[in-house]
């Protein structure tokens, strides 16, 4: 029950950014272009290791990703088992992979491209702010402040985060 509410809250946040943020066309067009780039360059992107250590992205991202999943690997199987009662193993595997991938892509496309639009088109220099020693969380708030009723978006995000954690840890 709470998992279903989480899904609605998550999509409400995405729709808030997509339709109320004023960058709908940019988000959709850039999203399709990025999916095309992913399909076109998938092999190269998935095997990129930065052997000359020119930028360290591959190594830093791997460390971050592994640390992230080490934190969640304990709770995730219980959560998936809790929401998968009565389903076949095939449905659980494909559902977890498919819906997880779709949710991740949607959130990266909508939230990422909204922030990119603010950086590129509207002068919200979040990248420069972080590069000059600013806190990442403050940069996120700078982007939220460009939305109509930013306090409502933050409240919706906070409620969604609490619901997601509650659902995951309840399993």
Give the residues covered by each predicted segment:
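Short amphipathic alpha-helical segments
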Residues: 139, 157-158, 171
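Helix-loop-helix module between adjacent transmembrane segments
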Residues: 1, 24, 159-169
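Membrane-embedded translocation segments of transport machinery
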Residues: 1-87, 94, 99-154
């Amino acid at each position: 029950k709470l998992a279903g509410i989480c899904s609605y809250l998550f999509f409400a946040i995405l729709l808030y950014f997509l339709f109320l943020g004023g960058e709908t066309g940019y988000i959709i067009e850039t999203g399709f272009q990025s999916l095309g780039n992913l399909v076109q360059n998938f092999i190269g992107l998935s095997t990129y290791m930065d052997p000359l250590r020119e930028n360290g992205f591959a190594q830093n991202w791997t460390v971050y990703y592994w640390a992230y999943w080490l934190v969640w690997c304990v709770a995730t199987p219980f959560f998936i088992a809790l929401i998968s009662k009565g389903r076949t193993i095939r449905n659980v595997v494909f559902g977890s992979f498919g819906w997880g991938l779709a949710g991740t892509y949607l959130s990266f496309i909508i939230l990422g491209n909204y922030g990119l639009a603010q950086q590129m088109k509207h002068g919200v220099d979040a990248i420069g702010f972080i590069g000059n020693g600013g806190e990442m969380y403050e940069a996120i708030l700078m982007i939220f402040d460009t939305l109509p009723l930013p306090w409502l978006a933050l409240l919706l995000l906070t409620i969604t985060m609490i619901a997601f954690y509650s659902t995951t840890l309840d399993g």
